[in-house]
């Protein structure tokens, strides 16, 4: 952020490309000025997208993978042996691990990344084992990108490994470090997204109770009133306090 220093305000930061702005915000926090926050519309105008989410996941490096075991209980572990393509994720594990067993039996997985800028990225999809004739290709790529793996699986011992792929997923971006908060959902591959959150129906009487109870002030007047979905926390305050039950939950 060469053209901005710590004396400048939010208006100056808004003019920066996203990556420079992120760097600058890190400088602000290091200097103890955590009260300065970029507005949610900054991130919207700078077009957060799937590619940026995947890049942020790659930069975080170690991601939390959640699966379901044979008894229906959630299991979670950290995974870093991951290779990123624009349209897919490939990752390595060993065939003898419970993680592999869960992926082979069920396949459903959620991956969570959390950045130092209070951004959360959650990928929900289904993993499958890569075709046998593609296993070596992706394994070699992952071992080249993650040199530590050679210490974990030296020489031919890597052959106990198996490569899984996720190429269809819902990717949710949720940023608590901006005001108002910012959220958006992206698609990896050909999948449909289930609608989430709260919506105001035609039963709205325009009393404004929902606006008063919204912590992010993301409800706008109208007929009916409208919730700005990209800034909604999904806290349910509007839903619980509407006097005529005009707010519905998807």
For the regions a protein language model found, what residue spans apply to each?
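Extreme N-terminal basic, low-complexity initiation segments
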Residues: 2-16
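A short, Trp-centered hydrophobic/proline-enriched beta-strand micro-motif
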Residues: 55-72, 109-113
């Amino acid at each position: 952020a060469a053209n901005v220093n710590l004396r400048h305000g939010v208006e100056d930061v808004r003019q920066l490309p996203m990556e420079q702005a992120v760097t600058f915000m890190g400088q602000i926090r290091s200097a103890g000025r955590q009260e300065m926050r970029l507005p949610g519309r900054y991130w919207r105008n700078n077009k957060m997208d799937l590619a940026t989410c995947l890049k942020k996941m790659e930069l975080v490096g170690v991601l939390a993978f959640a699966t379901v075991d044979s008894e229906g209980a959630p299991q979670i572990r950290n995974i870093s042996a991951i290779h990123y393509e624009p349209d897919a994720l490939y990752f390595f594990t060993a065939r003898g691990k419970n993680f592999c067993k869960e992926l082979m039996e069920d396949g459903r997985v959620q991956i969570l990344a959390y950045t130092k800028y209070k951004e959360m990225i959650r990928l929900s999809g289904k993993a499958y084992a890569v075709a046998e004739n593609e296993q070596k290709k992706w394994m070699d790529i992952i071992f080249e990108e993650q040199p530590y793996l050679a210490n974990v699986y030296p020489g031919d011992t890597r052959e106990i490994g198996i490569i899984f792929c996720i190429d269809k997923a819902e990717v949710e971006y949720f940023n608590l470090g901006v005001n108002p908060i910012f959220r958006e959902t992206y698609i990896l591959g050909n999948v449909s997204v289930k609608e989430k959150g709260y919506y105001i129906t035609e039963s709205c009487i325009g009393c404004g109770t929902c606006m008063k109870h919204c912590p992010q002030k993301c409800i706008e007047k109208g007929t009916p009133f409208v919730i700005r979905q990209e800034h909604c926390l999904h806290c349910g305050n509007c839903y619980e306090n509407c006097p005529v039950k005009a707010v519905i939950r998807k």
